[in-house]
Each structure stands twice: as C-alpha cells, then as structure tokens.
Amino acid sequence: MQCGIACIQMVCCYFGRKYSTEFISQYCHSTTEGVSLLSISETVKEIGIKTISGRVETNQLVRVILPCILHWNQNHFVVLYKVKKNRFYIADPAKGLVKYNLEEFKKHWVSTQSDGEEKGIAMFLEPTP
C-alpha cells in the first residue's frame, strides 16, 4: 500500500469517514514513486477535508490540532496523531504506531535548516460539514 493513500485513509477514519483504499485511489493521482503532497491535498479536498500545508518548526506542532500528515525522511508520509511531553506519536504506514523523542523525531522530519530554524513539511487538516 502506498504511504500517501494509507495516510489519507487514517485521517479520514479519524474524522469518522471510512473509505476503502480503492475509493481513495480513484481520486489520488499516483505514480511509480507514490503520491505528492499536492495530490494528497486535492484528494482529501474531494472527500470533504480542508488542508493547509507548509514548512513549520517543531514547536509549532505542539500547538496545532492533530492529526496532521508529515513529509518524513524526504520520501515518505506519516500521520502525527499526538504530542505529549516531548514525545511524538506517529502512525507510519510502513512501521505501525511509533513513538519518538524530540531528537529522533527531528532526524526524520526536519528538511530545512536556516538561521537557527529547523523546519519540516506538514499538512494540517480540518473536516468540512
């Protein structure tokens, strides 16, 4: 199963919307390399979930409504579903449920560093009525 499609399925389930992999695949434009963040965003929009994506700092993830989809290791997508006491709880389509401390989390997620700021790519989601 492709990680982007699996992440879409997980967040839809969280919001009480259960869709099969086949159904999601109809909307999600996939290539041999998987799906893009744009394709994930367009797919969830089609099924009633608004998104905002961008580069954010780790400390901003503590203040947002979860779950959110993260670009992981520059080539994978995971769902961040909880942050508690500097522990980051990840639903990884390849590994299952995994817990990371701050440093481990940053190794996988941070994609840019400049002027002392470390940022990674996140997609925040909100269901529409």
Language-model features: locations:
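Cysteine-nucleophile protease catalytic domains, especially the papain-like/related folds used
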Residues: 1-53, 63-66, 72-77
